[in-house]
Amino acid sequence: MSPAKTVGTLIMGIVNATPDSFSDGGRYLDAERAVAHALELVAHGAGVIDVGGESTRPGAERVPVEEETRRVLPVVTALAERGVVVSIDTMNAETAVAAVEAGARIVNDVSGGLADPGMLAAVAATSADFVLGHWRGPSSDMYARAAYADVARDVTVELSERLREAARAGMDPSRVVLDPGIGFGKTAEQNWAMLASLEHLVALGPRVLVGTSRKRFLTAALSDASAADSAPASAEEPSVARRDAATAVTSVLAERAGAWGVRVHDVAATRDALAISAAWRAGASWTA
């Protein structure tokens, strides 16, 4: 299956082969466990598995390329051998090329090629598609750069320029997927504003991937919703199940805005939400 030929909204399942990811750090650091989890996500409806070996959570420190490749290459190889469409989540050109050689068909760079100046040319020389994320700087101080005149307009303009840079590096625009970088260098309010105006980014033409899964701005919204609840549990941080439900809702809204794909931890919840959304739309053509 080519990710470009997917019918309906593609679900990209997340596999973090890291000890420090914000949501599931350490759970899938072992390659066998990571592969087993990835195959479970495929069984639940994931069309692509995104394998990462370096956390991009706020405040995360960079990982040496040698350690990153040690974490991800066995997982990429095993999944590709099983026919799974694999995406490599990396900001390093060396890791990207090694993963593509191991069978990855997509390179997902949250920095859009800014963290490693060699990334665009390196990916252009392969046959892989490229997810170009909106990025204003490293995770260690990303919120210091969250200044926008109009977040949706500014993100669209900045991604347009990165798209032109990718073309200048030799990458056909049809291979590029744009990611608005939800949770990267944006406040909670700016994340919501970007999502509410997602159709403007979609209108640029390239495919758009949206990743909201379990992110802090969802937790904040759920906590606000619980504030009026008199139960003692309302003061606790929202559970993973609640964050996954919130992710599924935002995934449906992204799909309705025209997103090509959504990147999530809980594939089954998002699959079901998208199925209900499709049935709702189809209801207009049903007869009593």
Regions inferred by a protein language model and the residue ranges of each:
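N-terminal glycine-rich anion-binding loops that anchor highly charged ligand groups
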Residues: 8-13, 40-53
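Pocket-edge structural micro-motifs
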Residues: 13-14, 212
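Short polar catalytic/cofactor-binding loops
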Residues: 16-20
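Active-site-adjacent loop and "lid" segments of alpha/beta metabolic enzymes
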Residues: 3-6, 23-37, 56-78, 85, ...
